[in-house]
Amino acid sequence: YPGFDAAFVQQMKTLCAGADYLLPNITEACFLTDTEFKTEYDRAYIDELIAKLTALGAKTVVLTGVSYQQGKTGVVVYENGTYQYYEHEQIAGGVHGTGDIYASCFVGAKMRGKTAYEAAVIAADFVLECIKESQKDPTHTYGARFEPALCKLMQML
């Protein structure tokens, strides 16, 4: 994972202790919790990851890239002892920048008064729209095309 050496991970763990919201994907969560990364997993594995993340000090965990069934992907939101899961279609092929877009959208939705779960859903749906927009243009080779989807984001908010 580029940019994630042991020193970086240790510093991130320190930051997690004061975090109100932690939004890692599964790979990042494994680094932060010293957990073996698995390509196939069940709910118990995800629950264990989230428990380890909250043990670092984060109050609310939004774990992205969680897939309990083929063709679907989603997020698990853990807040105040409650788990909520949201999923949508999984689109083949990766697009750079979706994690940054997700985090930015999540924060924007929270600033607009949405709950953590509502913000997680809005961010997931917006990222999905960005990926779809990116795939419409075969000449676009780097980064998610978020600009064409901004109108949809404003409707979601």
Q: Model features per residue range: what roles?
A:
Residues G93-A116:
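Short, small-residue alpha-helix embedded
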Residues Y83-H96:
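Short pre-catalytic strand/loop immediately N-terminal to key active-site residues, enriched for Gly-Thr
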Residues Y83-Q84, A109-A123:
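Phosphate-handling active-site elements
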Residues P2-Y83:
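Conserved phosphate/ATP/ADP-binding segment of small-molecule kinases
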Residues Q10-K13, A17, S104, V121, ...:
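Residues on a specific face of well-ordered alpha-helices
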Residues E28, G65-Y68, Q90-A92, A123-L128:
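Glycine-rich beta-alpha junction loops
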Residues Y117-L157:
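Charged C-terminal helix
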